[in-house]
Structure formats: structure tokens, C-alpha cells
From Swiss-Prot:
Gene: isdF
Induction (record text): Repressed by fur in the presence of iron.
Family the entry assigns: Belongs to the binding-protein-dependent transport system permease family. FecCD subfamily.
Disulfide bonds: none
GO cellular component entries: plasma membrane
Species of the source: Staphylococcus aureus (strain MSSA476)
Assigned keywords, A-Z: Cell membrane, Iron, Membrane, Transmembrane, Transmembrane helix, Transport
Protein name in UniProt: Probable heme-iron transport system permease protein IsdF
Pfam family, one: FecCD
Principal location: membrane
Length: 322
């Protein structure tokens, strides 16, 4: 009971930190706001500075929160579905497939912009299915599966490079220049994906069972692995439709959360949601304040942090095999 209460207290502390970070991000930037500016806005309704920030900065913050949460949860789900601690949507080519589909849709059917998360999901599904089919035939270990994923990532990025030579191919890059319609589109996918994940989370712990153990308790492990994988691909692909590829968030957060609260997915999923949202928000905030008025993309900061962590996890995986 004491451990459970400690986890609840930790979760509440993380929520407070997340809210505080969101506030700092809201008032920090080229146009700075004071607390009095906000009070004036909410009491009189007249403050042009706050109005401009609400239209320019608030959508960016909300999208950072949703994307961070979705990518972190997607990483945790992929690791559960593939039974691979190194799995992440960007590394295994899911994000690249989704981005190619996004580019094609914007060129040929731009009127379906509202459905981009769903259409990107179709693109992200292709590399995921290739990984699954190859794994079922060759039974890759964790590192070999990631190497196949990296090969797919390189291949698909080559295709993407060719496609983007066409100036009509609009590819989203990072969190800048986001508007309220982007928030609404992503919010639908975020709510749907995260709610389904919470409903599925009690079953995720059973994915660690082998086939014989699963059958003995009447658990259809293959069905739930597929459901978990599809949900992970959907969450990652939906973010790609709005902000493009963001690396390593799906690896960093689940492993940090496991160190904090253990591997129980009922606890891991909510914590990953909050920490993922916070981490991307911090990366975006740092990118805005390190070298103003220039902005460093949040993806660059994530890559600097995530690259060494991936190397560490690969070394740890190899050490466990010895």
C-alpha cells in the first residue's frame, strides 16, 4: 500500500511539473508575457499580446504535449508487442512509411487533410508488417530486428528524399507554425489512441508469457500482440501526420519510466504519457531559448539525448546474451 501511495504522489508531482513547464513555455519566447498580462486578459478581455500568443504559441504547446505523450506510449506498446526493448516507431521505419503516405496524400488528395492521421497510419503499417513477416520467418533477436528496421528506415527515407524534390510535397517539420486546425486533428487521434491504450493496459502484462502459458489461462496472445502493435503504429503515425519524424522519444521515456515505477503497464502507460509530454515540451522550450531569435528543432535535442541511450541499450542487450 505504501509503494502504491508513493507512486500516486510521484504521479501528482509529475503532473504539477508538467503544468508548470507548460506555463513557462507559454510566457517565454520572443514576445514575453507577465502574470499581470494574463490577469488583464482574463479580467478585461483586452490584451493584444496575449491574444497573439494564444494563436501562435498555445497550439504549439498543446501539440507538443499530445505528440510527446503519443510517441512515448507508442514506444512502450511497440516494445510490448515485439518483445523488444529497442523497438521504436522511428527506428523500425514506421514513421518514414507514415511520412511518405502523408506526402502523397497532400499531393494527390489535399482535400482529405482532416483524415491525414488515418491515412498516415496506412503508410506506417507497411514497414511494421514487413518487420513482423520477416521476424516470423527468421526469428530475429532484439538487435537483428532493429538492424532490419534501420534498413527499412534508410530505404524509405531514400524514397522520401526523391518525393520531396517536388515542391508540392509539403512535409511537416517539427512543432513550428502550428495552427488550431492541427490541434483539433491531432486531438481526435490522441484521445482515441490513449483511451484505447488505457483500456488495453491490463492485458499488456500478459504479453510476457510464452505461448504455452498463455494458452493455459485462455489468453489469445497473438491477437493482443497484433492489437498492441496496431495501436502503437496508429499513435506514432498520427503524430507524423502533423509534426513529421521525432526520434528516440519512444525509447527514452519507457525505459526511464521502468526505472522509476517498474514494468507494470497499468502504471507504466500513465507515467509514460505524462513524462513523454513533459520531455518534448522541455526539448521545444530549450530549442527556443538557447539561441534566440533562432530556434533549434526539438528533434535535434531529442537525437542528442536519445542517440547515447540507444547505444547503451544495445550494449546492455548484447551483455544479457553473453
Amino acid at each position: 500500500m505504501m509503494i502504491k501511495n508513493k507512486k500516486k504522489l510521484l504521479f501528482l508531482c509529475l503532473l504539477v511539473i508538467l503544468i508548470a513547464t507548460a506555463y513557462i513555455s507559454f510566457v517565454t519566447g520572443t514576445i514575453k508575457l507577465s502574470f499581470n498580462d494574463l490577469i488583464t486578459k482574463f479580467t478585461t478581455g483586452n490584451n493584444e499580446a496575449v491574444d497573439s500568443i494564444i494563436d501562435l504559441r498555445l497550439p504549439r504547446i498543446l501539440i507538443a504535449l499530445m505528440v510527446g505523450a503519443m510517441l512515448a506510449v507508442s514506444g512502450a506498446l511497440l516494445q510490448a508487442a515485439l518483445q523488444n526493448p529497442l523497438a521504436e516507431a522511428n527506428i523500425i521505419g514506421v514513421s518514414s512509411g507514415a511520412l511518405i503516405m502523408r506526402a502523397l496524400c497532400m499531393l494527390f488528395i489535399p482535400q482529405l487533410y482532416f483524415y491525414l492521421p488515418l491515412l498516415s497510419f496506412i503508410g506506417g503499417l507497411i514497414p511494421f508488417l514487413i518487420i513482423i513477416l520477416l521476424h516470423s520467418k527468421f526469428r530475429f533477436n532484439a538487435v537483428s530486428m532493429i538492424l532490419v528496421g534501420v534498413a527499412l528506415f534508410v530505404l524509405l527515407n531514400g524514397v522520401l528524399e526523391i518525393l520531396t524534390q517536388n515542391p508540392l510535397m509539403k512535409i511537416p517539420q517539427g512543432l513550428t507554425m502550428k495552427i488550431w486546425s492541427d490541434v483539433y486533428i491531432l486531438a481526435v487521434s490522441a484521445l482515441l489512441g490513449l483511451i484505447l491504450t488505457l483500456l488495453l493496459s491490463p492485458k499488456l502484462n500478459l504479453l510476457n508469457l510464452d505461448d504455452i502459458q498463455a494458452r493455459s489461462i485462455g489468453f489469445n496472445i497473438d491477437r493482443y500482440r497484433w492489437l498492441t502493435g496496431l495501436l502503437a503504429v496508429f499513435l506514432a503515425s498520427a503524430t507524423v501526420a502533423i509534426v513529421g519524424q521525432l526520434a528516440f522519444l519512444g525509447i527514452i521515456v519507457p525505459h526511464v519510466v521502468r526505472k522509476l515505477v517498474g514494468g507494470n503497464y497499468r502504471v507504466l502507460i500513465p507515467f509514460s504519457t505524462v513524462i513523454g509530454a513533459w520531455l518534448l515540451l522541455v526539448a521545444d522550450l530549450l530549442g527556443r531559448v538557447i539561441q534566440p531569435p533562432l530556434e533549434i528543432p526539438a528533434n535535434a535535442i531529442l537525437m542528442i539525448v536519445g542517440g547515447p541511450m540507444l547505444i547503451y541499450l544495445i550494449c546492455q542487450s548484447q551483455r544479457n546474451r553473453i
